[in-house]
């Protein structure tokens, strides 16, 4: 599992950087950290297990499948957390 998690961590990092550049058009280190931290991943599952799953999908099916897994399982949780964070930062 450790090797899969190591690969999964790298795949998640690449996905996060590409996502930030596509959505925001800027390099945003703090957002990257929020998207990839163990604290955030714990909202999805046990962080090492989540990264290992990403790594397994990548190794067995390739980058597109791993990115799709992240889009289906990680991105929605991050989106909800960001909405909540923005509500706290900019109260109505």
Model-identified regions with their sequence ranges:
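RNase III-family endoribonuclease catalytic core
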Residues: 1-92
């Amino acid at each position: 599992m450790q090797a899969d998690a190591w690969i999964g961590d790298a795949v998640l990092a690449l996905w996060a950087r590409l996502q930030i550049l596509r959505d925001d058009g800027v390099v945003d280190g703090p957002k990257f950290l929020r998207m990839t931290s163990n604290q955030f991943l714990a909202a999805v599952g046990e962080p090492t297990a989540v990264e290992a799953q990403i790594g397994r999908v990548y190794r067995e099916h390739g980058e597109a499948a791993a990115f799709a897994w992240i889009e289906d399982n990680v991105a929605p949780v991050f989106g909800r957390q960001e909405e909540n964070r923005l509500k706290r930062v900019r109260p109505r």
